[in-house]
């Protein structure tokens, strides 16, 4: 699969050959969905907490005698049916993470990349560098490329000027190749890869 390479200024910079094993698959939405669910579950804080009857600070004395009052039998004021009592089956601090095999995660990433390529949402640029961290200049470059919502993936190290300039632009994410993931690929309209990112992906899945 051959794709044109452009510069940030929108000039032609040749072409690149993309591996069909990574970018040319028939996308499987079920595998992509499994990976997205895994990612979103893993990032949940799980810090929700409600006090149960054992954690409520209240007297443990029996409310009134067992017999002779005509009222229902009660032993504790900490039970859920009373105002101020403990919560029955309330949320507890826990991890929401689920297991997903590494092979399935790797497969999902390939299918997400293939889905972008199939939909025409994949752009390859020669490099993502700026001499100075000027957001205004980068906004102009993105307008020329037609980027309003994009995930930009560079090599192992980001260019500091580019990363700082892009930080304040809405709907633009910049990540090193180590941070590429299915959810971020899907949540933006365009996926922009540098040539270094393409080489790193092909080396990763070789």
Swiss-Prot record:
Keywords: Ribonucleoprotein, Ribosomal protein, RNA-binding, rRNA-binding. One of its GO terms (molecular function) is structural constituent of ribosome. Pfam families: Ribosomal_L4. It comes from the Bacteria. The keyword Secreted does not apply. The keyword Membrane does not apply. InterPro entries: Ribosomal_uL4, Ribosomal_uL4-like, Ribosomal_uL4_dom_sf. One of its GO terms (biological process) is translation. One of its GO terms (cellular component) is ribonucleoprotein complex. One of the primary rRNA binding proteins, this protein initially binds near the 5'-end of the 23S rRNA. It is important during the early stages of 50S assembly. It makes multiple contacts with different domains of the 23S rRNA in the assembled 50S subunit and ribosome. Forms part of the polypeptide exit tunnel. Belongs to the universal ribosomal protein uL4 family. Part of the 50S ribosomal subunit. This is Large ribosomal subunit protein uL4. The lineage of its organism: Bacteria, Pseudomonadati, Pseudomonadota, Alphaproteobacteria, Hyphomicrobiales. The gene is rplD.
């Amino acid at each position: 699969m051959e794709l044109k390479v452009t510069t940030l200024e929108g000039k032609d910079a040749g072409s690149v050959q993309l591996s069909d094993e990574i970018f040319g698959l028939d996308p499987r939405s079920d595998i992509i969905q499994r990976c997205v669910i895994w990612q979103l579950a893993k990032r949940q804080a799980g810090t929700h907490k409600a006090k149960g009857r054992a954690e409520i600070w209240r007297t443990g004395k029996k409310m009134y005698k067992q017999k002779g009052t005509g009222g229902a039998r009660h032993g504790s004021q900490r039970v859920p049916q009373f105002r101020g009592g403990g919560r029955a089956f309330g949320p507890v601090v826990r991890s929401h993470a689920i297991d997903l095999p590494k092979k399935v995660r790797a497969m999902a990433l390939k299918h997400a990349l293939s889905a972008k390529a199939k939909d025409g949402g994949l752009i390859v640029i020669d490099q993502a560098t700026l001499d100075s961290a000027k957001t205004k200049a980068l906004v102009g470059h993105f307008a020329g490329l037609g980027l309003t919502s994009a995930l930009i993936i560079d090599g192992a190290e980001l260019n500091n000027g580019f990363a700082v300039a892009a930080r304040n632009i809405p709907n633009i994410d910049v990540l090193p190749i180590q941070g590429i993931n299915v959810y971020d690929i899907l949540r933006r309209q365009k996926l922009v890869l540098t040539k270094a990112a393409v080489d790193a992906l092909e080396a990763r899945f070789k």
